């Protein structure tokens, strides 16, 4: 498989369990990066979200962490081939054990297949299932690593997101419901959370496709700085 090419960078992914997908790209394009100087990407995989953060922001330091050593090595390689190599690095470490200065922005496309049969490929299991990182552990780690006034953005299926929001010590400030087609069921939810805010959350929605099975104008608009086809 050749590299997945974006407008300003490419992602090599042959040896990585979880390839570049719609969830990660959509989150990376949607999250608010304004004012973020230090960014953490939990479960960085290929490093695609961290690379998108580097393209979109003026952050001085962007760190991707992953428990898969092969993914971490690949992310560092992808970072080194990018225009922003001095601002990016990947660490092979469970977030529960990760120690660092606080981050202004934390992003994650976390594992969520909690009830399905485990993949026979152990590395895909790590990437796709919550066997090594539960949502409560994720929340504890984010709260520990998030700076005052910082934000946490993630994408999950609806049921898991509602469960996460209900148990989180953080509060939603932005939310976007993601549909495959207009009028269909919600397939994913993106949320941005912060500490102790009393503000009313900004609510959005996006359909990836039109009824004619073409990419929607709103999806094209949000991802146009990245996908070659837009």
Identify the meaning behind each predicted range.
Residues 110-137:
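Mobile active-site "lid"/loop adjacent to the S-adenosyl-L-methionine
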Residues 184-230:
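SAM/dcSAM-binding transferase cores
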Residues 10, 61, 87-89, 171-174:
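Conserved beta-strand segments of alpha/beta enzyme cores
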Residues 27, 109, 138, 193:
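Residue-level signal for inorganic ion chemistry
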Residues 26-108, 114-120:
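Conserved SAM/SAH cofactor-binding pocket of Class I
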Residues 1-34:
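Class I SAM-dependent transferase core
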Residues 12, 16, 20, 133-186:
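Conserved Class I SAM-dependent methyltransferase catalytic core
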């Amino acid at each position: 498989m050749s590299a997945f090419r974006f407008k300003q960078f490419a992602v090599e992914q042959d040896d990585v369990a979880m390839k570049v997908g719609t969830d990660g790209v959509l989150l990376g394009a949607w999250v608010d990066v304004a004012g973020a100087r230090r960014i953490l990407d939990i479960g960085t995989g290929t490093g695609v979200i961290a690379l998108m953060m580097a393209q979109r922001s003026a952050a001085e330091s962007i760190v991707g962490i992953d428990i898969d050593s092969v993914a971490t090595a690949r992310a560092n390689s992808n970072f080194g081939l990018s225009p922003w190599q001095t601002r990016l690095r990947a660490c092979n470490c469970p977030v529960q054990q990760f120690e660092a200065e606080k981050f202004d922005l934390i992003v994650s496309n976390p594992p969520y297949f909690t009830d399905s049969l485990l993949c026979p490929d152990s590395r895909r299991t790590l990437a796709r299932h919550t066997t090594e990182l539960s949502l409560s552990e994720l929340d504890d780690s984010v709260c520990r690593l998030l700076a005052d006034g910082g934000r946490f953005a993630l994408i999950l299926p609806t049921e898991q997101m509602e469960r996460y929001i209900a148990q989180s010590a953080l509060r939603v400030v932005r939310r976007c419901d993601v549909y495959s087609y207009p009028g269909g069921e919600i397939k994913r939810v993106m949320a941005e959370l912060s500490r102790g805010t009393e503000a009313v959350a900004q609510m959005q929605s996006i359909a990836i496709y039109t009824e004619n099975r073409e990419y929607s104008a709103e999806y094209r608009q949000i991802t146009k700085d990245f996908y070659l086809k837009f």
